[in-house]
A protein has these predicted regions:
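Active-site region of glycoside hydrolase catalytic domains
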Residues: 1-98, 104, 115-136, 160-166
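Residue-level preference for long, well-ordered alpha-helices that form the structural scaffold
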Residues: 29-33, 102-110, 143, 147
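Arginine residue identity/basic-tract feature
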Residues: 35, 39-42, 51, 111-113, ...
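Alpha-helix boundary/interfacial micro-motifs
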Residues: 69, 73-75, 101, 149, ...
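Surface-exposed substrate-engagement region within the catalytic domains
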Residues: 109, 113-125, 136-159
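Aromatic-rich peripheral "rim/lid" segments of glycoside hydrolase catalytic domains that contact
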Residues: 140-232
């Protein structure tokens, strides 16, 4: 609780992520996990009643396990449930990849997991977010067409569901040692943050063209980094 005492009631935009993914004993003992969350939440909120707290279900933060979380009453505005989907991209599972070319079955499987979280939100009144997702475990070169399609679909589905999300991991897009964005991955990052999504009734692949934006008002991550690096 040292961190909670250190910040007290300052830095209101700061939230505490208690356990990114429950593992070991807590991953197999729901009662113990709920007790840990309950005690920690009460202690933190005794210091700052408005502090935002993130908690994750077991089974590696699976959305299917959200109903087993026991959340304190009247905590809808301060406790956010965190769940994960493809935190390291669509890796092979049981000999199969969950995403290849974006088939109807592959898209339906992803929508089903998102809908699981939506139904939990509607039933409990709590809000959830995706604590991390990625189009690939390690991306250093220009993304493939499959990765771009996956990123666009995931981002659009989560935005349509009004579920906020974090991107895993920032080091794939930003080189901390060099202090610069990785230009080859800029299209992928832009797609994950602000995807061009199809609207209802719109034919697949056809998007409304946006008017050109003056160069002075649009600065890409790579350009922003470059400008900072050359300023005195």
């Amino acid at each position: 609780m040292a961190v909670a005492h250190y910040f007290g009631q300052s830095s209101p935009l700061l939230g505490f992520d208690l356990i990114y993914e429950p593992s070991d004993k807590l991953n197999h003992n729901q009662a113990s996990l709920n007790r840990v969350y309950d005690k920690t939440i009460r202690t933190i909120h005794a210091i700052d009643p408005q502090r935002m707290i993130f908690i994750a279900p077991k089974l590696h933060a699976a959305p299917e396990d959200l109903p087993n979380l026991k959340l304190p009453p009247q905590s809808q505005n301060t406790v956010l449930a965190q769940w994960h989907i493809f935190p390291w991209g669509p890796l092979k599972n049981n000999g199969k990849y969950p995403w290849t070319s974006g088939t109807a079955a592959e898209k339906a499987a992803i929508r089903a997991r998102i809908n699981t979280a939506i139904h939990w939100q509607q039933k409990t009144g709590h809000v959830s977010w995706v604590g991390g997702w990625s189009p690939g475990e390690t991306i250093r070169n220009a993304p493939s067409a499959s990765q771009m399609a996956f990123a666009r679909f995931m981002a659009c589905e989560l935005k349509k569901a009004k579920i906020p999300y974090a991107i895993n991991a920032d080091t794939q897009f930003y080189d901390g040692e060099e202090g610069a964005w990785r230009p080859a991955l800029e299209p992928l990052l832009n797609t994950m943050i602000a995807p061009e999504c199809e609207k209802p009734g719109e034919k697949p692949g056809h998007h409304t063209l946006k008017p050109p934006v003056p160069d002075a008002t649009r600065v890409t991550p790579a350009e922003a980094s470059k400008q900072k690096s050359i300023s005195p």
